[in-house]
Design a protein with these regions (language model features):
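Phosphate/anion-contacting hairpin/loop surfaces
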Residues: 70-183, 191, 198, 204
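Gly/Gly-Pro- and Ser/Thr-rich, intrinsically disordered tail segments characteristic of DNA damage-repair
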Residues: 1-119, 125, 142, 244, ...
Length: 294
């Protein structure tokens, strides 16, 4: 599933290339995504001009003239593709085609059909059923150790599950949760409510750092994710633990372990991420190794 860095990459490209373009027509596949695409969508957005593109967590918010916003979620396999000159042969699994007045087109493709696409009056976005339950966006509101510790107070869920809970932090998914906890030297199985403030401080710092590093490389591509120009992200080559089961840790050479938590794969280093913090760890700040800086 595209996570915050992938969605932010798409957002920046959409903002750069589409703002100012006016929608001439819209064609829908008629197939249901995670929820039905409203039949009224073409009528709602036809004739409107794109005025801005925002993001909250994994949701894209495409603002249109007349105070209307397209709410989009890429789901497991969704992607937005932009064509200055559309291909003659249509691609499979394209569920929406927006044609602009200059002849360029924006396509929403989603093979697995877990995405979301609808239009909402901009003033009603805070009450939207998808957006209203999301926690803060970590790039818009960078977390702090004290803030995360307070949010996790009494939580029995694992540190990994805590990071994945979109009601607490919007945008972190399976790939980056494993990477963040490795960088912070926190065992993903530990109860979130038992982490000390300095440990949460390390998580907060690495969360911001990892997400920004991934954005700089246009995100991570393993199979389906592509940018607006159908290009893959290149952050996969920088991953420390994710999808590296049984390979040596880049920091200490211990084999990386893979476990399953809440039906999702988790990757970690048993040596760098001990199940119990070293004595005094909760009282001193963590340092970064050379592998972390690379």
């Amino acid at each position: 599933m595209p996570e915050l860095p992938e969605v932010e990459t798409v957002r920046r490209m959409l903002e750069t290339h589409l703002v100012g373009r006016t929608v001439r027509s819209v064609r829908l596949s008629g197939l249901k995504l995670r929820e039905p695409v409203p039949r009224a969508l073409p009528r709602q957005i036809r004739g409107r001009t794109l005025t801005g593109v925002r993001r909250h967590g994994k949701y894209l918010l495409i603002d249109l003239s007349g105070s209307l916003t397209i709410v989009s979620h890429l789901g497991m396999s969704g992607r937005w593709l932009f064509y200055v000159e559309p291909p003659e042969r249509a691609l499979p699994h394209v569920h929406a085609r927006l044609e602009f007045e200059d002849g360029s087109e924006l396509w929403f493709q989603d093979p697995r059909r877990f995405g979301v696409l609808r239009a909402v009056p901009t003033l009603r976005l805070p009450a939207d059923h998808s957006l209203a339950r999301l926690g803060p966006d970590p790039l818009a509101t960078p977390p702090t150790g004290a803030g995360l510790a307070e949010l996790a107070r009494g939580a029995r869920v694992s540190a990994k599950s805590f990071l994945l809970d979109q009601r607490r932090i919007a945008g972190v998914g399976n790939i980056y949760a494993s990477e963040i906890l490795f960088r912070a030297r926190v065992d993903p199985r530990r109860a979130a409510g038992r982490l000390a403030v300095p440990e949460w401080g390390a998580v907060a710092a690495e969360l911001t750092r990892v997400l920004n590093e991934a954005i700089a490389r246009m995100g991570t591509t393993f199979s389906m994710y592509r940018t607006l120009w159908n290009e893959p992200g290149t952050y996969a080559e920088k991953l420390r633990v994710y999808d590296r089961a049984d390979q040596p840790c880049r920091r200490c050479r211990t084999p990386i372990r893979r476990i399953v938590q809440a039906q999702r794969s988790t990757y970690f280093c048993p040596s760098c991420q001990p199940s119990r913090p070293a004595r005094g760890l909760a009282r001193r700040p963590m340092t970064r190794s050379r592998a972390d800086r690379g």
